[in-house]
Regions:
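Acidic/polar-rich alpha-helix caps and helix-coil junctions
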Residues: 28-225
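Polar, glycine-rich mid-to-C-terminal structural blocks
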Residues: 1-26
Length: 225
């Protein structure tokens, strides 16, 4: 049974700045920043990025305080709750947007070019946050994404990162897309130093506890451990 995220929380796990930058690549159809950024992350400069929202106080300090380049996780938080270890936001095990993006990905893989239904599913997710249709994007090459299988696949990776950040799907996505492939790993390392210690064929799995291996002669330790 999953507990709901905490009211304010700890900072044992932080996001990386590239995620903020990716959210800010595109503006909405009315010229504002993607609202998912506001509801997903805390970071220095958020108040100026979203002047339409109140500059709330956290532990008595405004959330545009000088945090340097650090990025904190906000999704599911109650923002300013004084209570620890719980809140009344339910954790979504599977969201409709996740299903739409997975369906779009599957349709793309089953066809030579992205079918119209795949593009429709992608645009439904974008439309919910008032982003333009991918064909009309002012940042991405929408005409290529909507007609080229490989380009559509690569863009879906970005859309899933933005829509589903902090929802426990990223690792599954990376494994499905081939994190055990050197080219994919190099691309990840270029923006996220956390992957610098990732070793092909080893780090994709955790080691089996050695005590379990010692107690069971039929159990083989995972490769390279």
């Amino acid at each position: 049974m999953n507990q709901a995220p905490t009211g304010i929380g700890w900072n044992n796990i932080e996001a990386r700045r590239w995620l903020v930058d990716y959210y800010k690549r595109e503006q909405t159809t009315d010229g504002k920043n993607d609202s998912r950024l506001f509801y997903t992350l805390w970071y220095d400069g958020a108040a100026s990025d979203f002047p339409e929202y109140p500059n709330q106080l956290i532990y008595g300090s405004p959330w545009n305080s000088d945090w340097g380049n650090r990025v904190f996780i906000k999704k599911y938080s109650t923002d300013a709750s004084p209570l620890y270890y719980w809140n009344d936001n339910n954790f979504r095990s599977l969201r409709y947007a996740d299903m739409l993006l997975l369906y779009a990905e599957a349709l793309n893989e089953l066809n030579a070019t992205p079918p119209s239904k795949a593009i429709e599913c992608l645009n439904r997710v974008r439309n919910r946050v008032n982003l333009p249709k991918i064909e009309d994007s002012k940042y991405y090459n929408g005409s290529q994404i909507s007609t080229n299988k490989d380009a559509f696949r690569e863009h879906l990776k970005i859309e899933r990162a933005l829509e589903l950040a902090m929802e426990c799907v990223r690792w599954v996505d990376l494994k499905r897309w081939g994190i055990n492939d050197q080219a994919t790993l190099d691309e990840l390392k270029a923006r996220d130093s956390d992957f610098n210690n990732f070793i092909i064929d080893k780090s994709i799995r955790m080691p089996i506890p050695q005590s379990e291996v010692d107690n069971n002669p039929n159990l083989n330790q995972n490769d390279q451990y």
